[in-house]
């Protein structure tokens, strides 16, 4: 069976996108892992599936699979690529696109300059919703490993995030602390780990160790998580530039009770076919 796909990226966070409306594709976990291999497959951080909506008041259903084959709740950079893909492939001509995901609904806006704004919904700081093992909600949590004690914020952006503030993003122990915290017992569903350097109240630098992927060039939900945690800790204002290794995103949030909005690029690289 030949499957049509597009390779896309958002600030270097790269995706294979499959139209599962005009095709009928089912991929096993082993097949996804094989396709994700950058030497023997296509190579990607996440695989995105475009599916028919589950509800008549939505345009599409959006599914996300990590490179390790696990289906996850949310991917912000992927959402921007999803929006560009469905327009590019003629699946819709709308500039405002509504989609369902495993963790809730998103609204995607195609901007005049070609960038995409995503209404990411409301952040959730309740430990049980992240999920994080904690007796109560805190601004900062103390998390201990055998050799390290870290102070972090935690939030769900539809998926679990832990954010650490660091003095210098270039020397942050991403490769050491990333996997330790991702798989820490206090995160029952594992977590994405952000390392945030505050440059000013409207500017941060960020590296993200993504759950099931390792460090990526960009993470949209990670950028949102870092911004909202910095905001509630009174370190950031309501509009922030987030510099990631792959480029910059603009994140806007007016505080609890309001949705987070993320704006950034979505790039098409090539189309192809793969035999399953």
From Swiss-Prot:
What GO annotations for molecular function exist for this entry? diaminopimelate epimerase activity
Q: In which pathway does it act?
A: Amino-acid biosynthesis; L-lysine biosynthesis via DAP pathway; DL-2,6-diaminopimelate from LL-2,6-diaminopimelate: step 1/1
The record lists substrate as bound by 13, 46, 66, 76-77, 159, 192, 210-211, 220-221
The cross-references to Pfam families, in alphabetical order and at most eight, read: DAP_epimerase
Tell me what reaction this enzyme catalyses. Answer: (2S,6S)-2,6-diaminopimelate = meso-2,6-diaminopimelate
Q: Does the keyword Electron transport apply?
A: no
Q: Which GO terms describe its biological process?
A: lysine biosynthetic process via diaminopimelate
What subcellular compartments does it reside in? Cytoplasm
Residue numbers annotated as active site: 75, 219
Q: Known EC number(s)?
A: 5.1.1.7
Which controlled-vocabulary keywords does the entry list? Amino-acid biosynthesis, Cytoplasm, Isomerase, Lysine biosynthesis
Name a GO CC annotation attached to this entry: cytosol
Q: What is the protein's known function?
A: Catalyzes the stereoinversion of LL-2,6-diaminopimelate (L,L-DAP) to meso-diaminopimelate (meso-DAP), a precursor of L-lysine and an essential component of the bacterial peptidoglycan.
Q: What is this protein called?
A: Diaminopimelate epimerase
Protein source organism = Pseudoalteromonas translucida (strain TAC 125)
């Amino acid at each position: 069976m030949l499957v049509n796909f597009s390779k896309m990226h958002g600030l270097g966070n790269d995706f294979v996108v499959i139209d599962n409306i005009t095709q009928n594709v089912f991929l096993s976990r082993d097949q996804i892992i094989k396709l994700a291999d950058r030497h023997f497959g296509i190579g990607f951080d996440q695989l995105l599936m475009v599916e028919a909506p589950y509800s008549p008041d939505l345009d599409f259903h959006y599914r996300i699979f990590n490179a390790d084959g696990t289906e996850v709740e949310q991917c912000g950079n992927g959402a921007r690529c999803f929006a560009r893909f469905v327009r590019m492939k003629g699946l819709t001509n709308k500039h405002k696109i509504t989609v369902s995901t495993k963790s809730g609904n998103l609204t995607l806006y195609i901007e005049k300059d070609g960038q995409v704004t995503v209404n990411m919904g409301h952040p959730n700081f309740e430990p049980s919703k992240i999920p994080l093992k904690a007796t109560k909600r805190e601004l900062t949590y103390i998390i201990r490993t055998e050799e390290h004690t870290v102070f972090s914020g935690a939030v769900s952006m539809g998926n679990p995030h832990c954010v650490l503030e660091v003095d210098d993003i270039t020397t942050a122990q991403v490769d050491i602390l990333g996997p330790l915290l991702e798989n820490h017992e206090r995160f029952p569903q594992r977590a994405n780990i952000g390392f945030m350097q505050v440059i000013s109240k409207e500017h941060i630098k960020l590296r993200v160790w993504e759950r099931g992927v390792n460090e990526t060039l960009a993470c949209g939900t990670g950028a949102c998580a870092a911004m909202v945690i910095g905001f509630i800790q009174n370190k950031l204002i309501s509009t922030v530039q987030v510099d990631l290794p792959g480029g910059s995103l603009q994140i806007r949030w007016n505080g609890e009770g309001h949705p987070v909005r993320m704006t950034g690029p979505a790039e098409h690289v090539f189309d192809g076919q793969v035999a399953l």
